[in-house]
Structures are given as C-alpha cells and as structure tokens.
Amino acid sequence: MSKVCILTGKRPTYGNNVSHANNRTRKRFEPNLHTKRIWVEEEKRWVKVRVSAKAMKIMSKTGTAELAKLIR
C-alpha cells in the first residue's frame, strides 16, 4: 500500500539527515497517515480511508461531502 493521502495527495518527500560534523545522508520524510473508518452519509456506509492528519482536520471542518466525491 502506497503512503499517499487520499484527500490531500500528500506523499513522502526526501531530504538529508545532517550530523554535527555536517555529514549528509539521504532521508525519507513520511506523511502522517492514519487509517480511519468514516461514515459517509451520502453513501449510507462506512468507508475505510488512509488520510493525513491535515486531511482529518479538513474533514472535521467541511464534513465528508468532499470525501464522498473522491470515492465515487
């Protein structure tokens, strides 16, 4: 399963670990993803989605209507 948020499209980014001696090694920054069961009123069913913390905040503000459009 890929580490991509279904709502915001966030995916891993890459950067460097930098030590005190300024040695650099490549690092992968993972998005803060959570698997959630969400009740979609329009569909009258539970949907299991993998969303980021930012997407959960968006859903709490706007509701699940935006999510229902993506599922169809």
Curated annotation (Swiss-Prot):
GO terms for cellular component: ribonucleoprotein complex; ribosome. InterPro entries: Ribosomal_bL28, Ribosomal_bL28/bL31-like_sf, Ribosomal_bL28_bact-type, Ribosomal_bL28_sf. One of its GO terms (biological process) is translation. One of its GO terms (molecular function) is structural constituent of ribosome. It comes from the Bacteria. Keywords: Ribonucleoprotein, Ribosomal protein. Belongs to the bacterial ribosomal protein bL28 family. This is Large ribosomal subunit protein bL28. It comes from Chlorobium phaeobacteroides (strain BS1). The gene is rpmB.
